Regions:
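A short beta-strand submotif of the Rossmann-like class I SAM-dependent methyltransferase core
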Residues: 65-71, 80
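Membrane-proximal basic amphipathic "stem/tether" segments
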Residues: 1-19
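A short glycine-rich, Lys/Arg-flanked "PGG" loop and its adjoining helix->strand segment in the class I
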Residues: 81-96
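Conserved class I S-adenosyl-L-methionine
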Residues: 96-110
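Hydrophobic adenine-recognition pocket in adenosine-nucleotide-binding enzymes
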Residues: 71, 87, 101-103
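A short acidic, Gly/Pro-enriched loop at the edge of an enzyme's catalytic core
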Residues: 53-66
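A short His-aromatic
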Residues: 74-75
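Class I SAM-dependent methyltransferase SAM/SAH-binding core
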Residues: 20-55, 105
């Protein structure tokens, strides 16, 4: 968990300093004011209510960075693939995408 938090903070530090348009998918209650935040159950009025199983509500090349943490594993395989395609569609050329998923191998060992 600490490793994930450290990398997320590092990612946010880099992105905030060099990029202007970033998308945070499935943010839950951890939305970032500098991001365009979307979630199926928004925890704050500034978060866009949207189900990613229906695609992303943004045009192509809209963001310099796309981030989602612990979202992909909640989707069926076909919807997960479709969401990844959508992420790359809304990502500008040369943009950054960061995806965090659980380490299933580590979980099985315990």
């Amino acid at each position: 968990m600490f490793y994930s938090i450290l990398h997320t903070k590092f990612f946010l530090m880099i992105v905030k300093n060099i990029m202007k348009k970033y998308l945070n998918i499935g943010c839950g209650s951890r939305y970032h004011p500098a991001f365009e935040n979307i979630d199926v159950n928004p925890a704050h009025p500034s978060i866009i209510k949207h189900n990613v199983k229906k695609g992303l509500p943004f045009p192509a090349n809209a963001f310099e960075a796309v981030y989602h943490s612990h979202v992909l594993e909640h989707l069926p395989l076909d919807k997960g693939k479709a969401m990844l395609e959508e992420c790359f569609k809304v990502l500008q050329p040369g943009g950054i995408i960061r995806i965090a998923v659980p380490d299933l191998e580590k979980m099985v060992r315990f």
